[in-house]
Amino acid sequence: MIGFVISLILAISSLLLGIALIFRKVKPNHFYGFRVSKFVFKSDDIWYEVNAKGGMHLIIIGGILMIIASLALVYINDNILQGIFVFITLLILALGLILSLIITYNLSHILAKEKGLK
């Protein structure tokens, strides 16, 4: 049961956080969004582009976690598999966020260079 619950909560959280970023509803701030370099605060265009890309990554991560939650639901009575689902969920979340941070960091520098900020 724990694998299902954790996967589902993290999947829904990732999806909801990503949706707001994709639709560019989050204004530049220091609390919510991909603040990967100083350049995201120097231009609203860079902020929205980087956060839209990061939001897409969160949607993809959330979709993968939703699949894991579905599998965990099928095996809800197997405690060993539930533990494995928790591990897989946390591993995918961590790796996905690390990759997303690397990609959005590079994107912020590319956009800053294009705008003459770098």
Where are these regions (language model features)?
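Membrane-interface helix-boundary signature
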Residues: G3, S7, N51-G54, N79-V86
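Membrane-water interface of transmembrane alpha-helices
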Residues: L16-F34, I102-I110
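Alpha-helical transmembrane segments
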Residues: I2-I19, V86-L97
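Alpha-helical transmembrane segments and their immediate juxtamembrane interface regions
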Residues: L81-K118
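Select subsegments of transmembrane alpha-helices in polytopic membrane proteins
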Residues: N51-L65
